[in-house]
């Protein structure tokens, strides 16, 4: 009777080791949460053009987990790659009519962190528009 239990314990240990090894291997291939250069578009209601520029955003992989058994009484918190330290820059949009403030301020990521998503400052949706999407006429203004 002692042998089947011993084999089961060894199998569980091997299975656990394989799962841990695969998790570590997978995470080494995924880009970490860090500032990256990205082309983004900024626009403002009332101005006929959007400005396409280069800035630094937070992008990359954060370890998350989701329970196998979900309960309506529990809340799942997913960590996302988001801003830790940020600086704001202001640009002037071209061809804004009189009476419309042509200035717009956008964030520049200085450092990033895996934390809960703050909807006030981040787009936490599953499928969002591309960062360089414009609803109005595009004008390139590529700066870092």
UniProtKB/Swiss-Prot annotation:
PROSITE patterns: GLYCO_HORMONE_BETA_1, GLYCO_HORMONE_BETA_2. Residues 143-144 form a propeptide. SUPFAM superfamilies: Cystine-knot cytokines. GO terms for cellular component: cytoplasm; extracellular space. InterPro entries: Cystine-knot_cytokine, Glyco_hormone_CN, Gonadotropin_bsu, Gonadotropin_bsu_CS. One of its GO terms (molecular function) is follicle-stimulating hormone receptor binding. Glycans are attached at residue 37. Disulfide bonds join 33-81, 47-96, 50-134, 58-112, 62-114, 117-124. Keywords: Disulfide bond, Glycoprotein, Hormone, Secreted, Signal. Residues 1-27 form the signal peptide. Heterodimer of an alpha and a beta chain. PANTHER family: GLYCOPROTEIN HORMONE BETA CHAIN, LUTROPIN SUBUNIT BETA. Involved in gametogenesis and steroidogenesis. Belongs to the glycoprotein hormones subunit beta family. This is Gonadotropin subunit beta-2. It comes from Cyprinus carpio. The gene is cgbb.
